[in-house]
């Protein structure tokens, strides 16, 4: 490893640690007294086997996640897959704190956890997870692509009726697709972990910001797409900037 790479890796670690240390997750109030995923989370969990790692997601990984997710949200908003058109579909943005929470989650080496994920900025972010295993592991980019494809294929079982009523927290094996196309989600951040236990394993996890959870529909229908948008996104014509204010 060159000195430049060593410096970049050390700098990335310092930045991640500074984000984590900026907030004392142990003092946050969590429902039902649950432990917070970021509280005293200095190392890897008991399920992690040998040589656990959390590879850094670089700009090319972040760009790919946002491009594919926002493409999907856009075509759904336009009425693809026989779904109703969406009156408003925010274009997702990347959030570093959500990504940090996702990275902390993956350090447990489990796909799902009941641990609290609330922060001072976000109340109970949603979560989507994917796990892969084998004699070898593909590249980080391939793992991310496999995860997004796995979540996307849940569309084959997600119906128009589900679009109209899919209560928050419900999981019929379709939660990941429902999360990806929800108009209540405005930001995303993801993390990746790899370890060896019998064989090689990888876990990809995304935390998602829900701006509200009272409405049971995945998104609000419209006579046409973007009818509740003041101005559509320059790249995704069926989407709207995530910070545009509106009333439900």
From Swiss-Prot:
State the protein's name: Tabinhibitin 10
Which SMART domains does the entry mention? SCP
Q: What keywords appear on the UniProt entry?
A: Cell adhesion impairing toxin, Hemostasis impairing toxin, Platelet aggregation inhibiting toxin, Secreted, Signal, Toxin
Q: In which tissues is it expressed?
A: Expressed in salivary glands.
The compartments listed are: Secreted
Keyword Transferase on entry? no
Q: What does this protein do?
A: Inhibits platelet aggregation induced by all agonists tested (ADP, arachidonic acid, the thromboxane A2 analog U46619, thrombin, and snake venom snaclecs (TMVA that activates platelet through GPIB, and stejnulxin that specifically acts through GPVI (GP6))). May act by competing with fibrinogen for binding to glycoprotein IIb/IIIa (ITGA2B/ITGB3).
Motif interval(s): Cell attachment site:
221-223
InterPro entries in alphabetical order: CAP_dom (IPR014044), CAP_sf (IPR035940), P14a_insect (IPR034763)
Pfam families per record: CAP
